[in-house]
Regions:
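Short beta-strand segments at enzyme active-site cores
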Residues: 11-13, 47-59, 101-104
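Short, active-site-adjacent cap segments at secondary-structure transitions
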Residues: 18-20, 55-59, 111-112
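Ordered, amphipathic secondary-structure segments that act as subunit-interaction surfaces
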Residues: 86-87, 92-100
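A charged helix-plus-loop insertion that forms the helical arch/lid used to bind
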Residues: 61-83
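N-terminal glycine-/serine-/threonine-rich phosphate-binding loop
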Residues: 1-49
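Hydrophobic alpha-helical hairpins/lids featuring a short glycine-rich hinge
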Residues: 109-110, 114-118, 128
C-alpha cells in the first residue's frame, strides 16, 4: 500500500463493463476480486467509497433478456431488479470480509439544491464515519 500511504479516503467507480460479461451474466469472479481489494484497502485504514453503476446490466441478465432494454420503462424495470441483486451481492461479499455496507442514492438535483446538497453531505459524512459503504446510482 506504499502508493496510497498519504491517502485518507479513496473513491472507486465501477461500471457495467466491470460487473457484467458481454453475454449479460454477472462477472462474479471480478466482483469478488474488487471487493477483496477494496476490503484490504479499508482494513489498512483508508476509508473507501464504492460508486457503482451496473444495475441495468445486472438486471438485464437476471431477467434473462436477450439485450439491454432501449426504452425507458424497460431500462427502469431492469434497473429495479438489478439494483436489488447488486446490493445483495455487495452486502454478501463485503460481509465475508467483516464490512457492513449501505446505499446512498441521489440525483443531480440533490447536488444542485443548496439545502439538499447540505443534507446529502451530512448523510455522506455520517455514512463515512460509521464505515459503511456508500453506493450511488
Amino acid at each position: 500500500m506504499a502508493v496510497l500511504k498519504d491517502v485518507k479516503r479513496l473513491v472507486v467507480k465501477v461500471g457495467t463493463s466491470t460487473l457484467v460479461y458481454d453475454n449479460g451474466k454477472t462477472n462474479i469472479r471480478r466482483m469478488h476480486k474488487l471487493i477483496s481489494v477494496l476490503s484490504d484497502i479499508e482494513n489498512s485504514g483508508i476509508k473507501v467509497t464504492l460508486v457503482s453503476s451496473g444495475a441495468i446490466g445486472v438486471g438485464t441478465g437476471k431477467l434473462g433478456l436477450p439485450e439491454r432494454p432501449k426504452d425507458t420503462p424497460g431500462r427502469q424495470a431492469a434497473s429495479t431488479v438489478g439494483q436489488c441483486e447488486l446490493m445483495y451481492m455487495y452486502d454478501k461479499m463485503f460481509s465475508e470480509y467483516g464490512h457492513k455496507i449501505g446505499q446512498l442514492l441521489f440525483t443531480k438535483s440533490d447536488v444542485e439544491s443548496p439545502e439538499r446538497r447540505k443534507n446529502l453531505i451530512n448523510t455522506f459524512d455520517t455514512v463515512s464515519y460509521t464505515h459503511l459503504r456508500a453506493h450511488e446510482t
